[in-house]
Each structure stands twice: as structure tokens, then as C-alpha cells.
Amino acid sequence: MLPRNPLRSLLLLAVQVFVALGLLGAPSTDAESQERRSKVRISNAGFTITALPLLAARDWGIFTANGMDVELIVIAASLAPAALAGGDIDYIAGVGPASVSATLSGLPARAIWFSSDRISYWLMSRPQFKSLEDLKGKKIAVSGGLGGTNHVALVIALEKSGANQKDHVMVGIPGQQIQLLYALESAFVEGALISPPVTFNAYKKGFNKLLDVGSMVEMPGGGLTALVKTIQSKPTEVKKVIRSLQSAKDEIRKSKAKTVDLIVRILKMDKEASSETYDAFQTTLSPTGIPNRAGIENLVRSLQAQGRFTDRKIAFTEIADDRLATEVAKELGYKVP
């Protein structure tokens, strides 16, 4: 018989204890699975209707089903690019003037997915103004500053309608959409570019819908922006995020009652306004989520209207990378050219 080795006996005992405790070769527990989920931080400028796919993916467990542990962080659109560059967040839930401007200014980031490819805005007027012709020489309010996405979308829509933007006086009004309604009611302006749910309130008060701007202009609303290094080094994770958001968007399209309940709970609207907002919002959704050239070109145009980046010809690939969204769309069964 071989002499007893105290060290060998101690090691064997340790192995037996680990096996008994389920720590060696045991199946993964729920807690361990949670640890292995991809931990991802996504910023959003605010929980508005454009953030609905993001909120649905979180609240309906779609991120979790795709193996992701997602933290949503509210960060102003103007500050999000710096947070992305500094590693404080992994993705920006948006594609708009702020993110595109940051990319064109040197941030190595790309738009990789669109939530909507149209924005839900109506040009509305005071009751006595029944047409665009009636608004000649009158003031039209837009939220924020002139040269922003909604302002440029209005200019494009006016051009498509045969009108000249120079025939109207554009007024930028800071604050929320409700401020535009107040400006209309007080007769400070004769027209205003308004989005849901304020649109519905304005219509009930007798204001006229003159132009459905969203149906006339391709312009991204919501979306996803990521660093180039993330796209290149973590394509599997990026596709999981895109798949989660696209799946949430598909569920939104299919399930009005479920989505209206989410709008009521998260966005604090009443049932009627939530239902009307849903009807308007779902018409803007990008079918596949693949970034399109027309939307990106109109975003660039909105920046150039402010006198920025006018000295260069800007290619789609400088701003967007549609490859992973295309892969996800094909995997989900969409017909992609």
C-alpha cells in the first residue's frame, strides 16, 4: 500500500466538497445566467413616443430574452455623444442632428438602426386660416431653434406642396410641444408644426390641419447609434440590441391594446390620447429598421441649413452603417433587396 499523502487527501476532500455544493461541473443557476448576460447601457433623450420600441423592449422582457441586461439612461441629445465617446454609455437610442453632427465633427460613430423613417408632425393653423395660401406673410412656430430636424422637414414639405418658405415667417419657440399650442391659442402665431398628442388637442379646439409633414418627408425618428469600434469588435452584441428593438417594434405593430396600455403607464397619457397617438405613431415606423439614404440626406440638410458642414460632400457611409441591421432584417424574415 502506498503511503498516505496528506496534501493529496486534502485536495480530494476539497473536490468532494465542491461537488457536494454544486460548485464544480454543476448546471448554471439563474443568477449565473444573469451574470453572463451582456450588460449594456443605452441612453435616450427622454421617454417620449419616439422611445416606445426601447421602452417596450425593456418592459416586455425582449432584451432579457435576447440575453441582455440593459440599463436605460436619460441623457440630453447634445450630451450623449460625449458620454458615448467617454465609455459612459454603449449606445445612443437615437439618430438625429446631435448624433450626426458629432459624427461629422470627428466622433467615430455610425447610425446603425432606424425606429421610424418619418416624423409625425402636422402643420396646424388658427381657425380662420384654411390653406397655405392663407398663411402667406404669417408666423409659423416650430419647437426649438430654426434649422432643426422639424423645421427642415417643414421646409421640404412646403416645397413639395408648391409653396415657398420665404412667404412665411418661421418662429422658433423653446420648450415642449404644448408651448406651440399656447402660442396658437394666444394668436402669437397663426400656424404651428405640432406632433401627437398635442395635435389631437389642437384639432379638438378647432385648429385646422393644413399639411401632414411626416407623410411627405423621410426623416429618422429614434434609432440607434454606436461607436465604430463597437460595431467592429462586438457584432454579435450589436445584432442582439438591434434584434430586440426590431422585435419590440414588430410587437407594437401587431398589438395595439398591449401598446396602448404601455403608453398609458409609461408616458402618462389617458386612454383616448394613447390610442390616437398609437395610430399616428405606427404609420411612421420603419418596416425593416435599416437606415435609408433619404433620411440621412435630410438630416445632413438640416445641419447645412444652419451653415454647418457646407464645404464638403457627405457620403452615407460617413454617417451610417446599415450592414448589421440588414443582417438582422434578413434573419427576421424581411424581404431585403
Regions found by a protein language model. Give the residues of each.
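Pocket-lining segment of extracytoplasmic ligand-binding domains
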Residues: 170-267
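Ligand-binding clefts/hinges and TM-proximal coupling segments of bilobed small-molecule sensing domains
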Residues: 147-164, 168, 244-276, 317-318, ...
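Secondary-structure end/capping motifs
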Residues: 233-312
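N-terminal secretory signal peptides that target proteins for export/translocation
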Residues: 1-9
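Bacterial N-terminal signal peptides
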Residues: 12-26
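Short, glycine-/small- and polar/acidic-enriched structural segments
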Residues: 34-186, 190-196, 209-218
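Conserved C-terminal helix/tail region of periplasmic/extracytoplasmic solute-binding proteins
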Residues: 304-337
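Boundary at the C-terminal end of the N-terminal hydrophobic targeting segment
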Residues: 25, 31-33
